[in-house]
């Protein structure tokens, strides 16, 4: 069985999840970002089909405590020296804006591409799954379920619980993902060739945290 490598883009905890500003203070928000990213990465590491995890972030400690099993890459930096990963665009910004799918303009898409290129360079032959780091309910068995559904598809994606966003993006070897993250990304990913996977609505793979209402999710850490 071909192994999967996971790419997890994580924002600087100090600036992530801006839409939760009214529900959580800055420290609580930063703590929540770290806690959710750590929970997501732990689920991936415990999944049977995942060989390794690459975290892409502008923060030196996006997981709070570094894990020796995780490769940490810096977020791509724009030519003016500013980090390209803003908070615009829901799950992380970076709408394509009409550029070629393999050359994202900036933001989350650029971070995803950096992680994918690292995997392609260091683990040739591996499949790639991009997982947003805000899935606190995600279980290892749910990760394996998604990857088994995606194993025979060149490119696929997992829609969020609302059916409009994207929580996971997959590409089997030798294909590369075409990231189109931002509001309404599920439709854009489908248009770019990532077929939607029929993952159960109750799966933690679909329950991301973006809005205050999402904090009521059973597995969501309270506060931080």
Regions found by a protein language model. Name each.
Residues 167-194:
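Short, glycine-/small-residue-rich phosphate/pyrophosphate-handling segment
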Residues 132-136:
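The conserved acidic donor/metal-binding loop of glycosyltransferases
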Residues 33-50:
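A short, N-terminal amphipathic alpha-helix
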Residues 66-87, 95-127, 185-188:
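Short phosphate-binding loop-to-helix
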Residues 1-20:
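N-terminal nucleotide-binding beta1-loop-alpha1 segment
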Residues 184-224:
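Conserved alpha/beta core of the MobA/IspD/sugar-nucleotide pyrophosphorylase nucleotidyltransferase superfamily
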Residues 138-163:
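Conserved donor-nucleotide/metal-binding helix-loop-beta segment in metal-dependent transferases, i.e.
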Residues 50-72:
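Acidic donor-binding segment of Leloir-type glycosyltransferases
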């Amino acid at each position: 069985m071909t192994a999967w490598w996971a790419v997890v883009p994580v924002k600087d905890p100090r600036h992530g999840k801006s839409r939760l500003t009214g529900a959580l203070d800055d420290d609580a928000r930063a703590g929540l970002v770290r806690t959710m990213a750590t929970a997501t990465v732990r689920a991936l590491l415990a999944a049977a089909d995942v060989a390794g995890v690459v975290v892409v972030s502008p923060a030196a400690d996006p997981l709070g405590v570094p894990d020796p099993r995780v490769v940490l890459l810096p977020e791509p930096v724009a030519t003016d020296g500013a980090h390209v990963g803003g908070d615009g665009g829901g799950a992380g910004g970076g709408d394509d804006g009409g550029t070629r799918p393999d050359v994202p303009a900036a933001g989350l898409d650029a971070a995803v591409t950096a992680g994918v290129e690292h995997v392609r360079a260091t683990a040739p032959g591996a499949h790639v799954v991009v997982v947003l780091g805000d899935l606190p309910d995600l279980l290892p068995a749910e990760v394996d379920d998604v990857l088994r559904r995606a194993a025979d598809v060149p490119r696929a994606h997992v829609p969020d619980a609302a059916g409009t966003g994207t929580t996971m993006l997959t590409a089997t070897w030798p294909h590369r993902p075409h990231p189109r993250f931002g509001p309404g990304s599920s439709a854009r990913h489908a248009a770019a060739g990532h077929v939607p996977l029929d993952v159960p609505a109750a799966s933690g793979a679909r329950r991301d945290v973006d809005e205050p209402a999402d904090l009521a999710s059973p597995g969501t850490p309270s506060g931080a």
